[in-house]
Amino acid sequence: MANSLSVHLVKELREKTGAAIMDCKKALEVSKGDIDEAEKWLRQQGIAKAKKKSERLTPEGVIASYIHAGDKIGVLVEVNCETDFVARTPTFKELAKEVAIQIAAASPRFLSKEDIPKEVLDEERQKIIESLKGQNKEDLDKVVQEKLEKFIVDSCLLEQPFVKDQSITVRDLICQRIAQIGENIVVRRFVRFQLGEEIEN
């Protein structure tokens, strides 16, 4: 890569991913200047770093709030990190806000697939089977599994496509920020309010 092109690509990749300059340079070297491949490489590195940091305690963080336009939907979400210093950074606060907006827009019921009670999965599986009565039995198991996977993705915050970039999940977004910041980050809990929900006539 010519030096001017390299600087331009590093800047573009950094703007797209938020990764450190040295990481962007390394990604472009590995991918021989292909920015899409460099972005994939950074994502994989982020996941690897996130796994290494996932056991670290996260006693600090913020509670972010978001009120949707029209004041009909409100969200509170607790996002934790390791240090108060990181909790006060714009990057971390922006992540917490993005997660709150995701919750408002996509209405997740659970944090992750591990949080879905067995009875909820069993009930959903039964509903799917009932809706597929009369289908070819050979295909039934596959279709049921596919529909159940879609239910899990739709219902779980961390599995949902990120509303601002559908090519990644919320889990991927958090992994990217872990790699960028260098600390473990955990979405601890959230609550979503919608005006008039669960009000009986």
Swiss-Prot record:
Transmembrane segments: none
Segments forming a coiled coil: none
Region (Involved in Mg(2+) ion dislocation from EF-Tu): 83-86
Any one GO cellular component localisation term in the record: cytoplasm
Top-level division of the source organism's lineage: Bacteria
Gene3D superfamilies noted in UniProt: 1.10.286.20, DNA helicase RuvA subunit, C-terminal domain, Elongation factor Ts, dimerisation domain
Pfam families cross-referenced by the UniProt entry: EF-Ts_N (PF25025), EF_TS (PF00889)
Localisation: Cytoplasm
Protein name per the record: Elongation factor Ts
Gene Ontology MF terms: translation elongation factor activity
Gene name of the record: tsf
Cysteines engaged in disulfide bonds, as pairs: none
Family from the record: Belongs to the EF-Ts family.
Function field: Associates with the EF-Tu.GDP complex and induces the exchange of GDP to GTP. It remains bound to the aminoacyl-tRNA.EF-Tu.GTP complex up to the GTP hydrolysis stage on the ribosome.
Keywords, alphabetical: Cytoplasm, Elongation factor, Protein biosynthesis
